[in-house]
Design a protein with these regions (language model features):
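Hydrophobic/aromatic residues within transmembrane alpha-helices
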Residues: 56, 69, 124-125, 180-181, ...
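Contiguous mid-protein beta-loop-alpha structural module that forms a pocket-lining wall or clamp
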Residues: 153-214
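Glycine- (often His-adjacent) and acidic-residue-rich active-site loop
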Residues: 58-97, 147
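Conserved CoA-thioester-binding segment of acyl-CoA-metabolizing enzymes
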Residues: 1-57
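Glycine-rich beta-to-alpha active-site loop
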Residues: 102-146, 168-169, 173-174, 178
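Amphipathic alpha-helical blocks and their helix-capping loop/short-beta junctions
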Residues: 192-277
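Long, low-complexity C-terminal extensions of enzymes
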Residues: 255-272, 277-326
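Gly/Pro- and small hydrophobic-enriched strand-loop and loop-to-helix capping segments
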Residues: 128-150, 185-200
Length: 326
């Protein structure tokens, strides 16, 4: 299986559990067996007293996790047009249960979000209580390009971004860097890509029997101080006022038209975002508008319930299969 688990013992006998996604050729895309295995192991670690901290990471330099392994889902949907294949129902149920369990995990849960953190990878990162990004981090919910919609709890975290930024990112699938992630509260710490082993060694040196939160925070703060000089420039907060004005509209059709005015913009970041939308799925755009609006008033559990229903309905519609093919 493309997922490995290990336990490292610290100086005081406490153990750190590490789960490593290891499907480098697919940028560590999540398959159903990987999701189930991770859920089982995290549940076991949560109940094991000697496990004091858990880390999620991805193998390879390109990505932590670039999403779910959707090809098999699409094949199943094509084989059962207009229906919800059993594989799809099982996949989304397992993925969302895993994501929800991360949000409520009872121990320190560190996610190392280097490289591409897309779709399902964002679901893992946002569920952790210590979300780390690096200079190589590129975060996005790019479902506008495949006829799905931003799921894995994105209804929750996008709807809670400042102003209209969540709506904009959902409609365009635009990438954000490590600085953006910190600024928008989509990450907690910025470390260098090469500091992962230093972090692990630091965790193993902590005294997990007393003042754990203070010690852990001090470790992370010290590591971040070494990295902060390499933090990239912010991309999206400086453009927030413009985006808020652009998307101060009454419906998704007006939002679509407003974003398309950016196609002639000299700001290439905005121009590229508009191109993502025009080349994307109109159905996804309608779903994004509605999910962002509804999720503001939902609990996290309600959000995942809504997303499960949405995902099953997307499987019934040919837009998803066609979007992945294209």
């Amino acid at each position: 299986m493309n997922l490995h688990f290990e336990e490292l013992t610290g100086t005081d006998g406490a153990r750190i559990g590490i789960a490593t996604l290891d499907a480098e050729k697919s940028l560590n895309a999540l398959s159903l067996p990987m999701i189930n295995a991770m859920r089982d192991k995290l549940d076991a670690w949560a109940k094991e007293p000697q496990i004091v901290c858990v880390m999620l990471r991805g193998n390879g330099i390109k990505a932590f996790c670039a999403g779910g392994e959707v090809r098999s889902l699409v094949d199943a949907c094509r084989a059962h047009p207009g229906e919800v294949p059993t594989l799809a129902a099982n996949f989304f149920a397992a993925e969302y249960r895993l994501d929800f369990s991360l949000h409520t995990y009872p121990k320190p849960l560190i996610c190392w979000g280097h490289g591409y953190v897309l779709g399902g990878g964002m679901g893992l990162l946002q569920g952790a209580n210590i979300r780390i990004v690096t200079p190589s981090s590129r975060l996005a919910m790019p479902e506008i390009s495949i006829g799905l919609y931003p799921d894995v709890g994105a209804s929750w975290f996008l709807s809670r971004l400042p102003g209209k930024l969540g709506l904009f990112l959902g409609l365009t699938g635009a990438h954000i860097n490590g600085r953006d992630a910190i600024d928008l509260d989509l990450a907690d710490r910025f470390l260098l890509d090469e500091q992962q082993q230093e972090l692990i060694e630091g965790l193993l040196q902590l005294n997990w029997q007393e003042q754990t939160p203070m010690q852990l925070n001090s470790l992370l703060k010290a590591l971040q101080q070494k990295a902060v000089a390499q933090m990239p420039e912010a991309q999206w907060l400086p453009r927030r006022e413009q985006i808020d004005e652009l998307l101060d509209v009454s419906d998704v059709r007006c939002a679509w038209k407003a974003i398309l005015t950016l196609l002639d913009h000299t700001d290439m970041l905005l121009n590229r975002a508009a191109r993502n939308l025009i080349e994307g799925s109109p159905l996804t755009a309608h779903l994004v508008w509605e999910q962002i609006k509804r999720a503001r008033h939902m609990s996290l559990a309600q959000v995942f319930e809504m997303e499960y229903t949405l995902s099953l309905n997307c499987c019934r519609h040919p837009e998803f299969s066609e979007g992945v093919r294209a």
